[in-house]
Amino acid sequence: ECIKVLNVFEKGLSKSRNLALKNATQKLLVFTDDDVVFQQKFEKKIIKSFNSYPIHDGFRFQFLNSQGNLAKKYPRTFRSRLSKLEILNSSSVELVFKHESLTNAMIQFDENFGLGTEFFMGEEAIFVSDGIKKGLKIGFVPEQLVSHSQPSTGQKTAISAIYFVQSAVFYRIFGKMYLFWIALKLFFDLKFLHMVFYKHLQVCK
């Protein structure tokens, strides 16, 4: 296959992805990164998924961390649709879409979000959410496509900045309900910190 490289001077990950979408020519679009390793026969997993569920416009798959383990807690079985939590937990390296479906629904990445902008994350969740709101059928397939070792933005950024950006992401997706999702995130974050602190105390004893 031929590889097409596009050089631009604009800044912003979402702008780059939209440029790639505009210049894409194949029937299926795989969103990837420059530091992933594709698993053997990943393309067969993709084709099989779309052949098995032809009414779907896109799928969220799984990816592995550098240790070869699942990078996240995923559903164990196929899902014909994504829950709100699964939408929020989407990463670009998990996503594959039909080119025609994105074109017909006029779906693009929101260029106000993503690396290179003030709101430096959440563009994938917004992209998936916008697709569902416009009628695209997006499911989940429990198959691994890539391994990806790069730490997430959240692992390298201050907590206050993360909450600021995620508040904007939640508002963009859920509108007036965004406060509920902020409160829910805070609850689970505090619960996680409590568990870590408790384990630390047990070790110290």
Residue ranges and their predicted role:
Residues 1-7, 48:
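Acidic donor-binding segment of Leloir-type glycosyltransferases
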Residues 8-24:
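Glycine-rich, basic loop-to-helix element that forms the pyrophosphate-binding segment
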Residues 29:
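Short aromatic/hydrophobic "clamp" motif used to bind/position activated sugar donors
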Residues 41-74:
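Conserved donor NDP-sugar-binding/catalytic core segment of glycosyltransferases
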Residues 71-103:
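Short, flexible, basic/aromatic active-site loop/helix in glycosyltransferases
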Residues 109-111, 135-147, 159-162:
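Catalytic beta-strand/loop signature of glycosyltransferases that borders the donor
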Residues 114-127:
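Acidic donor-binding loop at a coil-to-helix junction in glycosyltransferase catalytic cores
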Residues 157-205:
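Non-catalytic, C-terminal membrane-associated alpha-helical segments of glycosyltransferases
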